[in-house]
Amino acid sequence: ELQVDYIDYLLLHGVGMGGMEEIEGRFMNNGILDHLLEERQKGRIRNLGFSFHGDVKIFDYLLSLHDAGKYTWDFVQIQLNYVDWRHAQEEHARNINAEYLYGELAKRNIPSVIMEPLLGGRLANVHAHIAAILKQRRPDLSIASWAFRFAGTHPMVLSVLSGMPYME
């Protein structure tokens, strides 16, 4: 029992990693997604979305259902940072370029929630020559702040999640 009248944002987590069978088994064939949509219709869920990880066919399929009006999404959580914008597959073969993911959502006016803006902390600790270029331009800014600003400056970004255990 949550003991609240409504949920502001409900997220289906980890969508896309296990293929079509998993998405259908976890959310569709068992009626869970239909139930969540009913709860949204009743006002008990204000915003329904999913976090995307993995197979772009699943992402495109869920957006096609949105386009058809069957399952509409209020937001989608995606991995977006200045490396993954155009070079996601260089990091991991299953990753999809954030430019594509964000662009498809923006075309549909679906806000994005951003995960991994620092790419697991690696963008806060860049190579010295890159850090020097950034510091030369704006010495007052931290290296991590460049990554956060990149992630947050796109107009359809709802929120940028830090995922950091320490402020440093």
Question: Model-flagged regions — what are they?
Answer:
Residues 12-168:
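Beta/alpha (TIM)-barrel catalytic core signal, keyed to glycine-rich beta->alpha loops juxtaposed to Asp/Glu
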Residues 1-17:
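Active-site gating/metal-coordination segments in enzymes
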